Amino acid sequence: MRKYFPEADTQLSEAVLRLAVALDLPALQIRIGSLLEEAVSRPYEVALYPVPNWKLKSGYLVDQALLLSIVRQESIFNERARSRRGARGLMQLMPRTATFIDGEQRYHRNGNADLLYEPQLNVELGQRYL
């Protein structure tokens, strides 16, 4: 899809955007929204500021808009984002920090750091850290 998208017309792009919203794919929404905004010179807020349907175990302890703005800034909603220093996931948590927040799970040992790529877990730990 990424291969063909740059050549897509506006109607097709808007259809793909609606599909990305329906399938809860916020990173794709932002990418399409940015390209559409450039193509037609008008903002696509629904795409540029997505509201994913994440079910957090403890609910939202921090304002949802604040959390989503941090996720947008840190990872652009890329669940597999990883910094050069080793921060992982949507909120760019370091494995040792996640271990400190959780208190039980050891994210910095035995390959457990990859658990931080799971969106709900990453956002849950991130909001607890805030």
What name fits each language-model region?
Residues 1-130:
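Catalytic glycan-binding domains that act on GlcNAc-containing polysaccharides
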